[in-house]
Amino acid sequence: MTEKKELILAFESSCDETSVAVIENGQRILSNVIATQIKSHQRFGGVVPEVASRHHVEQITLCTQEALEQAGVTYDDLTAVAVTYGPGLVGALLIGVTAAKAIAYAHHLPLVPVNHMAGHIYAARFVKPLEYPLLALLVSGGHTELVYMPAAGQFEIIGDTRDDAAGEAYDKIGRVLGVPYPAGKEIDRLAHLGQDTFNFPRAMLKEDNLDFSFSGLKSAFINTVHHADQIGETLDQADLAASFQASVVEVLVTKTLRAAQSLKVKQLVVAGGVAANQGLREGLAAGIESAGLDLDLIMPPLRLCGDNGAMIGAAAHIALAQNTLADLDLNAIPSLDFPYQNEL
């Protein structure tokens, strides 16, 4: 029997990428159009919400048209419309939500609301089918979370950052090093050229929880650089980057594998913008091997680690099957989060 073809038009506009995708049956990308705003925000050293919103207004219709054309489909072929409604920048989110609602209304299509962070996790569906229970390490500019999924569509935060997210720490360190925004890719490159000579702190590494903290590392890094400036000492940029990244990766890997062992999960999904970091990818793979864990490590391709509409379509396919739909009064929720589970 031929599988029924479900085509979802998916919108992502939570931060500084406008993306529209057409996804078939939750696992095949027919189109994934992304309009990035990085150059517009680089001179500010970070994302300016008002600038981001204006760019989304300019790009959302163009991206929608291009996504449909690349996929070779029309509105009449669609099964549903999906959209990120949080977390993110409220003005940016509203552009995508408004566009999705307008199309759903005009073409009498179901509207599927998607948590942006769930989208990052479900990007792994483009690599292989997910098996539950699984553990996801979510690392981005705004989040550093360990998420336990006992089943499809069920998310429980078991570890979170107490202060800065990992990606946020990378960008702040990048400003100190004089690296253009976004700094993660360049710091990762420099780290592979240097050595861990500064031995920066590994916060909360030995504490009996799965939470993270990167503010102490950030402060130690900044103080080291400022002290060197005051005494006229020149520090090796590659060694600084390597020392910073070694601290971040060791903490992320240690806590993640500790959780995976406790929960006896089948798969470990690495998701979010920082999932593109080669140091983190290498560290997790090496950690799993050295610990002798029977754990399937799933990492989306680099092009799907950042914000994109395809991941929203993958998540929406699950939500649609579970009849998780929204009315036309759907609104943006900038602080949207998963439920918390404090004890393993």
UniProtKB/Swiss-Prot annotation:
Enzyme Commission number: 2.3.1.234
PROSITE patterns referenced in this protein's UniProt entry, alphabetically: GLYCOPROTEASE
Keyword presence, Ubl conjugation: no
GO terms for cellular component: cytoplasm
Catalytic activity, as annotated: L-threonylcarbamoyladenylate + adenosine(37) in tRNA = N(6)-L-threonylcarbamoyladenosine(37) in tRNA + AMP + H(+)
Pfam families on file: TsaD
Record InterPro entries: ATPase_NBD (IPR043129), Gcp-like_dom (IPR000905), KAE1/TsaD (IPR017861), Peptidase_M22_CS (IPR017860), TsaD (IPR022450)
Protein's UniProt keywords contain Transferase: yes
Cofactor-binding details, from the entry: Binds 1 Fe(2+) ion per subunit.
Annotated compartments: Cytoplasm
Any Gene Ontology biological process: tRNA threonylcarbamoyladenosine modification
Gene Ontology molecular function terms on file: iron ion binding; N(6)-L-threonylcarbamoyladenine synthase activity
Keywords: Acyltransferase, Cytoplasm, Iron, Metal-binding, Transferase, tRNA processing
Group of enzyme by EC: transferase
Positions with a binding annotation for substrate: L138, V139, S140, G141, G142, D171, G184, D188, N277
Cofactor entry: Fe(2+)
Positions with a binding annotation for Fe cation: H116, H120, D307
Record family assignment: Belongs to the KAE1 / TsaD family.
PANTHER family found in the cross-reference section: TRNA N6-ADENOSINE THREONYLCARBAMOYLTRANSFERASE (PTHR11735), TRNA N6-ADENOSINE THREONYLCARBAMOYLTRANSFERASE, MITOCHONDRIAL (PTHR11735:SF6)
Protein task: Required for the formation of a threonylcarbamoyl group on adenosine at position 37 (t(6)A37) in tRNAs that read codons beginning with adenine. Is involved in the transfer of the threonylcarbamoyl moiety of threonylcarbamoyl-AMP (TC-AMP) to the N6 group of A37, together with TsaE and TsaB. TsaD likely plays a direct catalytic role in this reaction.
NCBIfam families associated with the record: gcp_kae1, T6A_TsaD_YgjD
Protein name per the record: tRNA N6-adenosine threonylcarbamoyltransferase
Species of the source: Latilactobacillus sakei subsp. sakei (strain 23K)
